[in-house]
Amino acid sequence: LYKLTGSFQNPGPYAGFLATIFPLLLQFFLQESSIKNKWLRLLMILLCNIGMLLFLSILPATMSRAAWLAVILGSSFVLSQHYKLYDRLRLFVAKHKKMTLPSFCMLGLLIAALCIGIYYLKKDSADGRLLMWKVTTHIIVEHPWFGVGIGGFSGAYGKAQANYFVSGKATEQEEYLAGSPEYAFNEFLHIAAETGLIGLFLFLGLLCASFWLAYKCRQWGVVGSLSALLTFSCFSYPFSIWQHMLLLVLLLAMCGNNRQEFHRRVDYRMVIILSIVLFLSKRLQ
């Protein structure tokens, strides 16, 4: 059915997996000078260059807008920390106060135009997600604290969607796009629907603690990759795919390492681990 799926059943999760790894790979490339061994450093440079070129050539072909947004946000964070773009921006604002407002207005217009273009690229798909999110919020309102139970989303969604259509509030476009999805295509809404606000807050607490640890240890690649995965999860269902869950566990585990340990042990070993994950995911399909 699909020509470009990698080790996955469709291009979406494949693109999301690549988008999640890319910021970490970018960080490895930017800090290759910290590796003392000459041959290991050359190997890292070669692997990173090949990997990034392959990723950048594959991602556009997947037509996954969520993955595009994820890789842009995750990589932007890594680059901003490595090149201290925030400090450079403050200096620019201080030196060119008159140009600040027009520059930000132009940037805002560019971002708005980009978002509109991405929306109309696959309009029906975007409208379908909006419908799923709307119906999922109805489930959360009906079961706010403990949700419908793990694995109960599909049945609850069918009932909530039927009630929404019976109410007469649905548009013709929504009736045309209606389906019976197994996922909310937004992991945060999905978690809230199945485990309630209590489960969602516990999950958000884990994420906040992990981000704080990673940021404190200056692990920009981990923060970037985790940000990319969470961005992708706002538009897809990565937590229902074991490869993405394994990647999430690896990223959360890396958040607690100190910076020296990260440089000494993770830089090259993590590339090997991720390669093994990709190989096993292909063999187990």
What positions do the PLM features span?
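Hydrophobic alpha-helical transmembrane segments in integral membrane proteins
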Residues: 115-131, 270-285
